[in-house]
Amino acid sequence: MSPQTETKASVGFKAGVKDYKLTYHTPDYETKDTDILAAFRVTPQPGVPPEEAGAAVAAESSTGTWTTVWTDGLTSLDRYKGRCYHIEPVAGEESQFIAYVAYPLDLFEEGSVTNMFTSIVGNVFGFKALRALRLEDLRIPPAYSKTFQGPPHGIQVERDKLNKYGRPLLGCTIKPKLGLSAKNYGRAVYECLRGGLDFTKDDENVNSQPFMRWRDRFLFCAEAIYKAQAETGEIKGHYLNATAGTCEEMIKRAVFARELGVPIVMHDYLTGGFTANTSLAHYCRDNGLLLHIHRAMHAVIDRQKNHGMHFRVLAKALRMSGGDHIHAGTVVGKLEGEREITLGFVDLLRDDYIEKDRSRGIYFTQDWVSLPGVLPVASGGIHVWHMPALTEIFGDDSVLQFGGGTLGHPWGNAPGAVANRVALEACVQARNEGRDLACEGNEIIRAAAKWSPELAAACEVWKEIKFEFPAMDTL
């Protein structure tokens, strides 16, 4: 070894492995307004102290690696490293705790959810020192959120485009989700829209399969939309699913939808990916298309309480990436969703400023500044008897989507749509008159059914249907 090499090796660098907590656990750190803050639920392996586990999360999701490297000396770790600045126990769980980590803004590419998630929820989730790891919440600073376009249009612009105010919007997923020909599919769309719905929807699985190619579906659905609009005098839409195997094909489908003059397209944002979703959102804003977002695959990521990522984080990511609607659970239907937690991330989707509220699972105050809001979509196992609860829980700025609750009507699709529209109008009128939907909901629906035979038939069919299972998503 030359003298020069010896000198370099002996100054400022010592090879080997050292505890993460010596560098990345900084309890005295005061967070900056520009930091991205994360709350992780950490379950360390037996014998791993909380401070070491929390510091390991901060290190492995930012600048750290398993051993000391000499190139650390070529940059400023103090400027770029993530910091575990606070640790707190999880009530009722001996082996779990919440680790709060602050990330400097310069770690992330502007306008890229893909890059942000690659760091924060990347390889660290496979780290052997941890038995499980879950990202519960993120605080996105205005300095970062302002680098995103966000939703193509937002709630107010959508209402202005549709000329619909003062009530939730009504939708319906066409069933059976797979197997219909394009012409029969378009017929079902027409019947539902003519009956009083604002939107119909492609199921998330419907892309371009042998039984129904995308171009045929788009054409027959456009015909249905224009026919229903002419008959009802209302603006109608169908969520044409542009999700495809490549970004180029996805954009091609969105271009065709725009050329048909329809108001809205759709994307499966998790299976399609954030890069594709952001690209489509940009196209939709530039070309006047609304963008409906389905969350297929979310439960793979968010349903386990100890590992993965909570949906409130996926909801924030979607607001940044871009979408005008997103499915957000129902509280009362067949899909997972506890009331206060669901309302917590619904507010994160719609509101400009959301205060920290741990009772609703919100770990950080979130200021979206001018990023447009997203309409939450309640969908999955809901029917006319749920209408009072849905109207009370979600309020006007929402989309209530009845698939089987429309198409399962004993008299057909159009009467099913009529039943839902009558039930909604009755609930909105009762609420505006000061009645309590939570207490008087069934009475309101029964009264409306007396002058709507379609609603009366729907009430009879679904009077015994319930989905009563304990929610997995609890605090």
UniProtKB/Swiss-Prot annotation:
Give the CC-aspect GO terms: chloroplast
Q: What class of enzyme is it?
A: lyase
Pro-piece positions:
1-2
Which PROSITE patterns does the protein's record reference? RUBISCO_LARGE (PS00157)
Identify the InterPro entries for this entry. RuBisCO, RuBisCo_large_chain_AS, RuBisCO_lsu_C, RuBisCO_lsu_C_sf, RuBisCO_lsu_fd_N, RuBisCO_lsu_N_sf, RuBisCO_lsuI
**Subcellular compartments:** Plastid, Chloroplast
Q: Where is this site: Transition state stabilizer?
A: 334
Sites of the modification N6-carboxylysine? 201
Cofactor-binding details, from the entry: Binds 1 Mg(2+) ion per subunit.
Write down which residues bear the modification named N6,N6,N6-trimethyllysine: 14
Which residues make up the binding site for Mg(2+)? 201, 203-204
Annotated catalysed reactions: 2 (2R)-3-phosphoglycerate + 2 H(+) = D-ribulose 1,5-bisphosphate + CO2 + H2O; D-ribulose 1,5-bisphosphate + O2 = 2-phosphoglycolate + (2R)-3-phosphoglycerate + 2 H(+)
N-acetylproline carried by residues: 3
Q: What does this protein do?
A: RuBisCO catalyzes two reactions: the carboxylation of D-ribulose 1,5-bisphosphate, the primary event in carbon dioxide fixation, as well as the oxidative fragmentation of the pentose substrate in the photorespiration process. Both reactions occur simultaneously and in competition at the same active site.
Q: How does it assemble?
A: Heterohexadecamer of 8 large chains and 8 small chains; disulfide-linked. The disulfide link is formed within the large subunit homodimers.
Family per record: Belongs to the RuBisCO large chain family. Type I subfamily.
Give the miscellaneous note: The basic functional RuBisCO is composed of a large chain homodimer in a 'head-to-tail' conformation. In form I RuBisCO this homodimer is arranged in a barrel-like tetramer with the small subunits forming a tetrameric 'cap' on each end of the 'barrel'.
Q: What is this protein called?
A: Ribulose bisphosphate carboxylase large chain
**Organism, as annotated:** Ostrya virginiana (American hophornbeam)
Q: Which gene is this protein's source?
A: rbcL
